[in-house]
Every structure is written in structure tokens, then in C-alpha cells.
Regions:
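Basic, nucleic-acid-interacting segments
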Residues: 1-297, 308, 314, 336-340
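Structural motif
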Residues: 3, 311, 335-344, 384, ...
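Amphipathic alpha-helical segments in well-ordered regions
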Residues: 64, 230, 347, 351-355, ...
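Core structural elements
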Residues: 190-203, 308-331, 341-358, 371, ...
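Extended, non-catalytic structural segments that build the interaction scaffolds
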Residues: 288-294, 301, 332-339, 373-385
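M16/insulysin-pitrilysin zinc metalloprotease superfamily fold
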Residues: 337, 344, 352-366, 371, ...
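Strongly charged, low-complexity linkers/loops
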Residues: 363-378, 387-457
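Short, amphipathic C-terminal "tail helix"
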Residues: 445-478
Length: 478
């Protein structure tokens, strides 16, 4: 059935900005406070209270403009978006409509090895609304105004997305960029980054269908589920002879289904007009250029550098660059040692990340321990200790139980790498093994593993396996 249909998707992503105060007031911009704790007269819509622009929000929008290839508009205007809801005490939302701060950007996504350019129509600043709470009392609803006035950057894509996988890839890439430039913390669980999905269906090659908007999706899992369900729902309606209504939809996470909340509004329903309490934003080129210097290295540039300059495998480099703190830790480690970056990268995404996960740590917590970590990796890389011994010592090093070299001595884990000593052990191991030696010389490579194991046993596991392997091959080929 769905083989004859295709989905067309555009996304409206709301990113809460990493500011200390709100967009138009001095109230703290922080998550997790007691209800209605971070509210002043401006936030609560008291008569006569005038908004004051937080210019840091403008700077963060400009930074996003550079990171996402936008045109940065020197002239932009804040307007009132008029609608009534209990958690919007002013009776309108201050947003940007006709003259947004950013227009015509794009981001490249990688969906299972397939590259695609996703165009972004616009990004504009606006204030968030409060929160209505309906599950405390069966008779009453409660309002928490802490979120009112929280600065949002709404990033609106063109309908260039055509699958749930592409949408998740787009959201993931967008989140990564915003976190790299320190504009948004990307915490979807707390609502710092959420998406409205505009989805329509059509037969392949036909005109665009009527779209429905699925509101406030705050996890990749829910985005995927909502898209897959809504795609099937719209096809079922059309194939049953029905017509898609332009509705605003809610995704029910308990049932995995979408349902209509209300008919979808058009822009003229909101009666936008310039906010008389706020002057237009007029930026100078100097202001824009000053922000550009703070953008820093973006994820794709870091990925390319790790692959080309440091010879790190692409899949491993992707894991390291997915979070900014991962990349910071990696670059700090390689700056403190002559161990090959590729070797460090393999340990980082393996045992080091495993330790971080098992102990519920922040990656940044290891930034003060990079010297100890790289000292340990140097011992492994130089064959002073085995890879197995390195894995045994790593948790002790990360828990601050001593220097790697001291722990090695204390536990007696230093490898036997003396060629003369190993030659004697190998010669003794080959005594009486004429039959197996003949098998090896006849082409049986498996016998080599048997001999290596025998020699390691003779050294109580402390023999350097690389050196044992080398000497054995020299002996067996004679």
C-alpha cells in the first residue's frame, strides 16, 4: 500500500538558548526550579511592564547563522503573535514573522552513508510560553510560569525530508551543531530541544497534499513513532475515500498514536503586528563579524580533521565527534603524548567510554586526568604492559588510585620484552615438538597460536606476545 505513497516533511525545531536570563526580562533562565519561582512582573504580563531585549540572544542567533549557512539579516523585527491560552499571561507571544533574523540556510545530513542537503527557510527568535499541568488534581489545572519568556530560536526547514530516518538524522545533526557552538544544551528530555513535524502524503510525482502538524516531540524515538503512525493514518484516510483536514496533532506516547487537538491555524489567524514596545533590531557589520570569531570548529570540520590528519577510522571518528565534550577530551589527550591518535581513539570509544557510562560520569570529568590516561596508553603502546594489563589498570587510574607506572610495579604487570630471555623460553617450548613444527612448515598456521600460548604460559602471561610471535616465526622457518 505505502509503496505507492511518499511522505513530505518539514520541521519546526525549537531550541532553548543557553542564556542566564530570559529573552525580555532579568528572570533566571533555568530548568528544575520550584513552580513560579523564576517569574517577574514582565513574565506575568502585569500592566505597564515593558520588555527589555537580552542582546546575548541576538548574538546566539548570529552564531547559529554562521554555523547553519544562513543569511544574517541586519534588520529584523519583533512582532506580537496574538492568541489566548492560560499559560500565556500577556495574551500574545513576542516572536518574529515578516522580518526574521536568519533566512535561507542549510545543513548537510548523512543518512546511512547517503549525503543530502536540507534547506532551512528561516530561524527567528521568540519567547516560550508557560506550562499547563493537568495531572495533579482531577478538578483543577495548574499553571507554572517559569518557562514564560525563555528565549527560543525556532528553526524552520523546507519540506525536504522524506522519511523518519532522514528527520532523525536532521534533528541529530542540528542538535550536534547547536551544542558545539554552545547555543543550546540539546537536552531533549528537559524540553531544551523539541520539534513540530509537518507531514503530508502524496502519490509519487503528484502535488503536495494537505499537511498536519504534530506538536512538541522531544525524543528521537517519539519523532520516529509519530511519523510512522501519521504516515499510515493519512494514507488510510485517503484510500478509504476521506479527506485530510489541516489539523494540529498530539502524539500520545502511551498508545503510539496521533490524534487531532484542533484545526490548524493560518498565519493571519494570529493577527501579527510589530510590537510597539520593542524597537527593530539594526545590526552593524562589526557586530556580526565580532560574533563570527566565537563560532569555533564545527562538527564536520572536526570529523574531517580526525580522519585525514589523525588517521582515525571514520566510524570511530563519528563516535568521538557526536558530542563536543568527547572531541575536547580526545584533542587534549593527543596533545599530551606522542602515542598515535588512532591508538588513543580506539581506547577512548572502547574502555574509557565504557567506564564513563558504567559510573554515570560526565565526559568532561576526565579532562583533569588526561595525563594519567595517556601515560597508561604509552605503556601499552610501547609494549611495557600488555593490552589486557592496560584494561585491568585503567579503572584504577581513572579512580585516582595512583600513577600508571606505580600500579604496574605494585601488581607486577610489566611485560617480559627481553629478547634473550624470550629466546631461551621459546627454545625450551619447542623441545619435543617436532611433529607440530612439521605441521607448521607444512602450512598449518594454527600451530603458531598453540606455540604462542605455550610460551605465554611459561612466562605466566607476562611475555610480550608481539615479540614472542616474531621470534617464534624466525625459529619455525629455519
Amino acid at each position: 500500500m505505502s509503496n505507492n505513497w511518499e511522505m513530505v516533511i518539514g520541521l519546526e525545531v525549537h531550541a532553548q538558548l543557553n542564556t542566564s536570563s530570559k529573552l525580555f526580562s532579568s528572570s533566571p533562565n533555568q530548568f528544575g526550579s520550584e513552580p513560579n519561582e523564576n517569574v517577574n512582573f514582565i513574565d506575568s504580563g502585569m500592566p505597564g511592564m515593558l520588555p527589555v531585549m537580552n542582546f546575548t540572544c541576538i548574538e546566539m542567533a548570529i552564531k547559529t547563522g554562521f554555523a547553519l549557512n544562513f543569511n544574517i539579516n541586519k534588520y529584523s523585527v519583533f512582532e506580537r503573535k496574538n492568541y489566548f491560552y492560560p499559560d500565556l499571561p500577556q495574551g500574545y507571544q513576542i516572536s518574529q514573522f515578516e522580518f526574521p533574523i536568519l533566512t535561507e540556510g542549510f545543513i548537510n545530513i548523512d543518512n546511512e552513508g547517503i549525503q543530502k542537503k536540507i534547506r532551512i527557510e528561516r530561524a527567528h527568535l521568540e519567547q516560550d510560553a508557560g506550562k499547563s499541568i493537568h495531572d495533579i488534581d482531577p478538578k483543577f489545572s495548574f499553571i507554572d510560569l517559569n518557562r514564560v519568556g525563555t528565549p527560543l530560536l525556532e528553526i524552520v526547514s523546507y519540506p525536504d525530508l522524506s522519511s523518519a530516518e532522514e528527520v532523525v538524522s536532521y534533528m541529530s545533526s542540528l542538535r550536534q551543531v547547536l551544542m558545539y557552538i554552545d547555543v543550546c544544551d540539546g537536552n531533549m528530555q528537559e524540553g531544551s530541544l523539541r520539534a513540530d513535524v509537518n507531514l503530508s502524503v502524496r502519490k509519487k510525482g503528484e502535488e503536495l497534499g494537505t499537511r498536519c502538524e504534530i506538536k512538541n516531540l522531544n525524543s528521537f524515538k517519539f519523532i520516529r513513532q509519530a511519523i510512522e503512525y501519521e504516515f499510515k493514518r493519512q494514507i488510510d484516510v485517503i484510500e478509504s475515500g476521506g479527506k485530510i483536514e489541516q489539523n494540529t496533532m498530539l502524539f500520545d506516547t502511551s498508545t503510539g498514536e496521533t490524534r487531532a487537538m484542533r484545526s490548524k491555524e493560518f498565519s493571519h489567524d494570529y493577527r501579527y503586528f510589530p510590537d510597539p514596545d520593542l524597537l527593530p533590531v539594526n545590526l552593524t557589520q562589526d557586530q556580526i563579524d565580532k560574533v563570527k570569531t566565537s563560532v569555533g570548529e564545527l562538527p564536520q570540520a572536526k570529523l574531517d580533521k580526525f580522519i585525514k590528519d589523525y588517521n582515525v577510522d571514520k566510524d570511530i571518528a563519528k563516535i568521538i565527534t557526536v558530542e563536543k565534550q568527547n572531541a575536547i577530551l580526545f584533542e587534549k589527550m593527543i596533545s599530551e603524548t606522542d602515542v598515535k591518535p588512532k591508538f588513543i581513539a580506539a581506547w577512548l570509544v572502547g574502555d574509557i567510554f565504557a567506564f564513563i557510562k558504567e559510573n554515570s560520569l560526565e565526559v568532561s570529568s576526565l579532562n583533569e586526568k588526561t595525563k594519567e590516561i595517556t601515560d597508561l596508553l604509552k605503556l601499552v603502546s610501547d609494549d611495557v604492559i600488555s593490552n589486557k594489563a592496560g584494561k585491568e589498570i585503567l579503572p584504577k587510574v581513572l579512580n585516582g588510585q595512583g600513577k600508571p607506572s606505580d600500579i604496574v610495579k605494585e601488581l607486577g604487570l610489566e611485560q617480559v620484552s627481553d629478547s634473550g630471555e624470550l629466546e631461551k623460553i621459546i627454545d625450551e617450548a619447542l623441545i619435543g615438538e617436532e611433529e607440530n613444527i612439521s605441521k607448521f612448515q607444512g602450512g598449518s598456521d594454527r600451530v603458531l597460536g598453540y606455540f604462542v600460548g605455550k610460551c605465554l604460559k611459561a612466562t605466566k602471561g607476562k611475555g610480550n606476545p608481539k615479540l614472542i610471535n616474531k621470534i617464534l616465526l624466525e625459529r619455525l622457518k629455519k
